[in-house]
Each structure stands twice: as C-alpha cells, then as structure tokens.
C-alpha cells in the first residue's frame, strides 16, 4: 500500500473509495495499485 498526498486511478480497474474518512484506491487486477491518502 502506497501512502500518497494525491491518490489517482492508475488503471481502469482502480476504484476510489472512502474508508473511515480516508480516501483510498483499491484495484482488483493489480494489488500494487493500492493507495491511501495521508
């Protein structure tokens, strides 16, 4: 999981979601695309 100031979708399978007030990107195709804003 990458922690970044600005989270962006990397591929078309990436989804931007909010969990516990944090913006996150989850990806079903490529787990390395997981990101969290912070």
UniProtKB/Swiss-Prot annotation:
GO MF annotation list: structural constituent of ribosome
GO cellular component, one term: ribonucleoprotein complex
Protein name: Large ribosomal subunit protein bL36
Entry similarity comment: Belongs to the bacterial ribosomal protein bL36 family.
A single BP term in Gene Ontology: translation
UniProt keyword annotation of Ribonucleoprotein present: yes
PANTHER family: 50S RIBOSOMAL PROTEIN L36, CHLOROPLASTIC, LARGE RIBOSOMAL SUBUNIT PROTEIN BL36C
PROSITE patterns: RIBOSOMAL_L36 (PS00828)
InterPro entries documented for this protein: Ribosomal_bL36 (IPR000473), Ribosomal_bL36_sp (IPR035977)
Keywords, ordered alphabetically: Ribonucleoprotein, Ribosomal protein
